[in-house]
Amino acid sequence: MRSLAVVVAVVATVAMAIGTARGSVSSIVSRAQFDRMLLHRNDGACQAKGFYTYDAFVAAAAAFPGFGTTGSADAQKREVAAFLAQTSHETTGGWATAPDGAFAWGYCFKQERGASSDYCTPSAQWPCAPGKRYYGRGPIQLSHNYNYGPAGRAIGVDLLANPDLVATDATVGFKTAIWFWMTAQPPKPSSHAVIAGQWSPSGADRAAGRVPGFGVITNIINGGIECGHGQDSRVADRIGFYKRYCDILGVGYGNNLDCYSQRPFA
């Protein structure tokens, strides 16, 4: 990944919603709001110009019951805001003095720039296909064969043989990102479980400062690099996207937005 190496060492099942799941993400975020959030994604300077569409997002979300449809209206809005914020950080083309602000430039990239590795780890379960490279692609910048394999199995596509689909088919790209979001990586909970209020931190979690909120989602995604050492500009960037998107959706941010004092998950 560009700023993140997602490492999923344990293949987990998709975390399905507990309780009431209803409707569609289209009832939570409209096309106009989506376009406002990702204001410059189709700018001529963006590598991903024309790739990430609202229709692809809605279609991908429909494949994961519970995503953006669990709990209260506010909980649903926060989940969509959190997902788009985290993935916006992974694909950002923004800078401090960018037009409309740094947080209007999410989804500018669809694949890792200047990848120097094939991200292939020898695996009997998820063997690399000859000549294929598993660098960061899509909204979450999915990396490594041991992520492409289980993600592909979950969505019914052979991504080990066809990793480029994550960056050439927007619905596939969104599906891999939502798969990652919905899937627990023990001892990490799923990001969905956290934002939907389904995760109860253990004593060890609390001792490590890991409590429910947007901050622990950053810890799940890239805690080993960004969390537990005080102020970090990457964490602040994620929070900036999240606050902007919550404001657009008209929902409060909740508590515990950063992971500055959280120890990373083991």
Swiss-Prot record:
Superkingdom of this protein's organism: Eukaryota
Spans traversing the lipid bilayer: none
InterPro entries tied to this protein: Glyco_hydro_19, Glyco_hydro_19_cat, Lysozyme-like_dom_sf
Pfam families according to UniProt: Glyco_hydro_19
Active site residues according to the UniProt entry: E90 (proton donor)
Disulfide bridge map: C46-C108, C120-C128, C227-C259
Reaction(s) this enzyme catalyzes, per UniProt: Random endo-hydrolysis of N-acetyl-beta-D-glucosaminide (1->4)-beta-linkages in chitin and chitodextrins
PROSITE patterns referenced in this protein's UniProt entry, alphabetically: CHITINASE_19_1, CHITINASE_19_2
Protein EC: 3.2.1.14
Alphabetical UniProt keywords: Carbohydrate metabolism, Chitin degradation, Disulfide bond, Glycosidase, Hydrolase, Plant defense, Polysaccharide degradation, Signal
Leader peptide range in chain numbering: 1-23
A single MF term (Gene Ontology): endochitinase activity
Gene Ontology terms: biological process: cell wall macromolecule catabolic process; chitin catabolic process; defense response to fungus; polysaccharide catabolic process
Role noted for this protein: Defense against chitin-containing fungal pathogens.
Family statement: Belongs to the glycosyl hydrolase 19 family. Chitinase class II subfamily.
Protein name: 26 kDa endochitinase 2
